[in-house]
C-alpha cells in the first residue's frame, strides 16, 4: 500500500493547489513547489503504460495529495508515494518526530485502500496483459464514479437506494413462497409510491429555493496599486478564516469582511505584498462555483 492518510489537518481551502503547497511546505521547507508558488504542480495520469512519474517531492518520493470532497473529511488528506517502502519510511519518520501543520499535530497512518493513482501503478507492475489490466482499471473507475455521483446527486442516490430496497423486497417475498405474478404487482406498487414521493419532494425543494440577489461588482481594473485588495462576488457564508487560508501570508495585516455585500477588503503591509498575492491568484478566482474578482481597492 503506497498511500497514507492524514488527520487533524487545518480545514482545507477551496483551492486544492494552495492546500497542497501548504502541506509540502511543512513536510519539506525546501520543496521547490512550496518555495515558488508560480511553479506549476505536476499532475500524474493513471498508469495505463510505462510513462514517467512526476514527483511532488523528490526527497520523499511523494506523488500526489488527494482531498475528499466530503464535508465530513475537511481535516483529512491522502498522500500517495511511488512505492510502499517510501510510504513506510515517511510514516516511520513522523512516528518518532511529530509533523505539525499550522500548529496542529497531524495524525497519520496507512490508508485502508490505495489511491486510484497508487492502485494503477500497482496494477501496472503486476499486469499480465493489457486487456485484463484495462478491465480492472475500468471497473475501479466505474465504482468510484458511481460513488461520487451518489454523493453529489440526491435524486440519483435515492433511486440507487430504491433499487436496493426492491431487491430486498423481492428476496423477502420469494422466501415466503409468494407467486411471481403477485411479487411483480407488489413491487410495482412499492416502486410507484416511492417515485411519486421523490417527485413531490423535488418539486417542494424547487419551490422553496429562491434565487439570491448578488451585489453589483465594481470595476477595479483602473484602480492604481495599493496595499488593500478588494475581493468581490464572494459566496454566501464565506468566513474570514476561509479568506485567510486563501489570501493569507506573513504580510497579511487585516481582513474586513462585508458579508451583506459579498465582498472583503484585505490589507497587507506593503503594495508589493498585495501585488504579489493578486498576481499569484489572478484577477478572478474560483470559489464554491463563484467567480470571485480580485483587484486593488480605491
From Swiss-Prot:
Effect on the protein of changing residue 4 to I: Sensitive in DMS protection of U1 snRNA
Single GO MF descriptor: U1 snRNA binding
Subcellular location: Nucleus
Annotated family: Belongs to the RRM U1 A/B'' family.
Main localization of the protein described in the UniProt heading: nucleus
Taxonomic path: Eukaryota, Fungi, Dikarya, Ascomycota, Saccharomycotina
Entry GO terms, CC: commitment complex; nucleus; spliceosomal complex; U1 snRNP; U2-type prespliceosome
Organism, as annotated: Saccharomyces cerevisiae (strain ATCC 204508 / S288c)
Protein name: U1 small nuclear ribonucleoprotein A
Subunit structure, interactors included: Component of the spliceosome where it is associated with snRNP U1.
Sections of the chain in a coiled coil: none
Effect of residue 268 to F: Splicing defects
Tree of life domain: Eukaryota
Remaining remarks: Present with 2950 molecules/cell in log phase SD medium.
Function of the molecule: Involved in nuclear mRNA splicing. The principal role of the U1A is to help fold or maintain U1 RNA in an active configuration. It is the first snRNP to interact with pre-mRNA. This interaction is required for the subsequent binding of U2 snRNP and the U4/U6/U5 tri-snRNP.
GO biological process: mRNA 5'-splice site recognition; mRNA splicing, via spliceosome
